[in-house]
Amino acid sequence: MDVKSYMQTLGRQAREASRAIARADTEQKNRALLTMAAAIRRDAARLLAANAQDMEHARAAGYDAALLDRLQLSEKTVAGMAEGLEQIAALPDPVGEIDGLKFRPSGIQVGKMRVPLGVIGIIYEARPNVTADAAALCLKSGNAAILRGGSEALRCNQAVAACVREGLEAAGLPAAVVQVVETTDRAAVGELITMKDYVDVIVPRGGKGLIERITGEARVPVIKHLHGNCHVYVDDRADLAKAVKIVENAKTQRYGTCNTTESLLVARAVAAAALPQIGAMLAGKGVEMRGCPESLAILQAAGVPADKLRPAVESDWYEEYLGPIIAVKVVDDLDAAMIHINTHGSQHTDAIVTEDYGRARRFLREVDSASVVVNASTRFADGFEYGLGAEIGISTDKIHARGPVGLEGLTSQKWVVLGDGHVRA
């Protein structure tokens, strides 16, 4: 296969289809989404069988546990894919909304209209649910999509794509509104991220290496996050029962996600009381703690097993482990915690546990992250939990889309000017 010609063809078809989907009405888009959801429910057994084949090949290829976790589907996750499509269908259509319309002294009215971005290229590893989520979000926001999933999920992605095509056909929309790249040749990625005549934005979802490559080589804008070094800070005015519960969920509910907590900061004034409780819980869950000298001394004195303790090195404060490991540090106070987070964090999601309203407000204002959380788990940093329906990704850049990216993040705004024969004086 001539990969360059193949990708150029996909790009041309997507650009043409983007004009059709941009003018599609809400009812037509929702009909496509609901048909896709019904097809996924009907074909659940086929999707799970394809996923089982992908899992078998991935294990044989030696993929790590974090990727296998993201790759695996279950009856529950397939049902969740269908539910996500139905939720997106139920969301308000942002396309065509006019914000801030106001009269100017000249008599004209000026406002901003929400419009699709155009053609979105989405590159992702594992996570077959992204095929459905991305297709749905792009479609509802009036965009065409070119989806390039990882080779490890090829069979399942193809099965999901068949359900997507069925929905497009039922709604009378061009099949090229959502196209799945069928080749596993990595050169396809290089072509996709440089097709500035056909692609308006790239959304990568995958490991750090993939994101760095795309960021360095892309010739079109990229909506991205590099990694997720999320923090929980336990303040000296925290409810310790809440703190233990929050850290347990934030760290151990699921290891392979970007909103999993990787670093625990504890105020010095409460460390002797908080760390033994948190350490016992983490050790019981099989989590290794890489601590500063002060935290290790407290944990050792509390009887936390030695095989779960290890001295932290400088790189641990930056690390996204994606596994049963957490960095632990005792800090002076809220100011020190915020300095640490803003220095070592990834600007993804960071949380404070405190009963002090003023400190919570400071944390919200001063921590420079896409999501900041008070008295709750970092695991809530998710489009579904935020009421966006599904999300197409998470952005840690300071652009129009920051944090979980849903429908509005896949639109732009253009100025609209309304007059009645007005001319400029």
UniProtKB/Swiss-Prot annotation:
Task: Provide this UniProt record's keywords sorted from A to Z.
Answer: Amino-acid biosynthesis, Cytoplasm, NADP, Oxidoreductase, Proline biosynthesis
Entry EC no(s): 1.2.1.41
Q: What class of enzyme is it?
A: oxidoreductase
In the record, what terms sit under GO molecular function? Answer: glutamate-5-semialdehyde dehydrogenase activity; NADP binding
Major subcellular location class: cytoplasm
Single GO BP term: L-proline biosynthetic process
- Where found? Cytoplasm
Reaction equation(s) it catalyzes: L-glutamate 5-semialdehyde + phosphate + NADP(+) = L-glutamyl 5-phosphate + NADPH + H(+)
Q: Which family does it belong to?
A: Belongs to the gamma-glutamyl phosphate reductase family.
Q: What does this protein do?
A: Catalyzes the NADPH-dependent reduction of L-glutamate 5-phosphate into L-glutamate 5-semialdehyde and phosphate. The product spontaneously undergoes cyclization to form 1-pyrroline-5-carboxylate.
- What name is this protein filed under? Gamma-glutamyl phosphate reductase
Species: Thiobacillus denitrificans (strain ATCC 25259 / T1)
